[in-house]
Swiss-Prot record:
Disruption phenotype: Increased mortality induced by B.thuringiensis pore-forming toxins Cry21A and Cry21B. Increased mortality and sensitivity to paralysis induced by enteropathogenic E.coli infection. Increased mortality upon heat stress. RNAi-mediated knockdown causes an enhanced resistance to polyglutamine or amyloid-beta-mediated paralysis and an increase in adult life span.
Name of this protein: von Hippel-Lindau tumor suppressor homolog
Organism in which the protein naturally occurs: Caenorhabditis elegans
Record bears the keyword Translocase: no
SUPFAM superfamilies assigned to the protein according to its UniProt record, in alphabetical order: VHL (SSF49468)
Assembly and interaction partners: Interacts with hif-1 (hydroxylated on 'Pro-621'); the interaction induces hif-1 degradation. May be a component of the cullin E3 ubiquitin ligase complex.
Pfam families xref list: VHL
Keywords noted in UniProt: Ubl conjugation pathway
Pathway of action: Protein modification; protein ubiquitination
Stored InterPro entries: VHL_beta_dom (IPR024053), VHL_beta_dom_sf (IPR037140), VHL_sf (IPR036208), VHL_tumour_suppress_b/a_dom (IPR022772)
Family designation: Belongs to the VHL family.
GO (cellular component) term, any one: nucleus
Gene that this sequence comes from: vhl-1
Gene Ontology biological process terms, A to Z: protein ubiquitination; response to hypoxia
Length: 174
C-alpha cells in the first residue's frame, strides 16, 4: 500500500519468538484501553502466536511470563494491530531488585490509522460475499486494499480458531 497504512512487512504477527535465557518470573497486567475487544498473544519459541485471552474494553489480564518473551495484541474483530505500551511488541523486563515483586502494567491502545485505512476496514463489517459488489465504484487501488483487508481478516480468524489454550510460558532450562 502506498500510504504506509500497512506497517512493517504486512504480516499479521512479527517474525519473533521467545528465548529461554532468563528464568526470572515477571508479572504483567495487560489493560485494554481500546473501544473494542482485543486478543493478547505470546509469541512462542517457534515464532507462533499463542492466544492468552480476549479483553473487553477497560478489562485486564494478569499473566506470569519471562524476559525475552514477546507479547502482542490484536483487535479481536479483524486482527488489526494495536499498541502495547505504545509499541507493537511488548518485551517484559524483570524488577530491578530480585526480592521485589512488581506487576508491570501494559496499556493496550489503538494505533493511529489513516482515513483511507479506516474507510477500507469499514467494509470488514459487511458480509464478505457482498463486499465485491459494494466496492465496484471505488478506484482499483482501493479495491485491492479492501480485498487485502478481507484476506488478512480470514487469516486472522484461522489463527485464532486453531489457537489451543496455553499451558503457560515454560520456565527456561538452567
Amino acid at each position: 500500500m502506498s500510504d504506509g497504512s500497512m506497517d512493517d512487512d504486512g504480516r499479521l504477527f512479527p517474525d519473533l519468538g521467545s528465548s529461554t535465557h532468563d528464568n526470572r518470573e515477571i508479572r504483567v497486567r495487560f489493560l485494554n484501553r481500546c473501544a473494542y475487544p482485543v486478543d493478547v498473544f505470546w509469541l512462542n519459541p517457534s515464532k507462533q502466536p499463542t492466544k492468552y485471552g480476549t479483553l473487553a474494553q477497560k478489562k485486564y489480564l494478569d499473566i506470569k511470563t519471562f524476559k525475552d518473551h514477546p507479547w502482542v495484541a490484536r483487535r479481536s474483530f479483524d486482527g488489526c494491530k494495536v499498541l502495547v505500551n505504545e509499541k507493537e511488541v511488548f518485551w517484559p523486563e524483570p524488577a530491578p531488585r530480585m526480592n521485589l515483586i512488581v506487576r508491570n502494567h501494559c496499556v493496550i491502545t489503538m494505533k493511529v490509522q489513516s482515513l483511507r485505512e479506516i474507510a477500507g476496514r469499514s467494509f470488514l463489517r459487511h458480509n464478505p460475499t457482498e463486499v465485491p459488489n459494494k466496492i465496484k465504484g471505488l478506484p482499483r487501488e482501493l479495491q485491492f486494499e479492501v480485498k487485502h483487508f478481507l484476506d488478512r481478516k480470514q487469516e486472522y480468524s484461522e489463527i485464532v480458531c486453531r489457537s489451543i489454550p496455553p499451558p503457560g510460558p515454560q520456565r527456561p532450562q538452567q
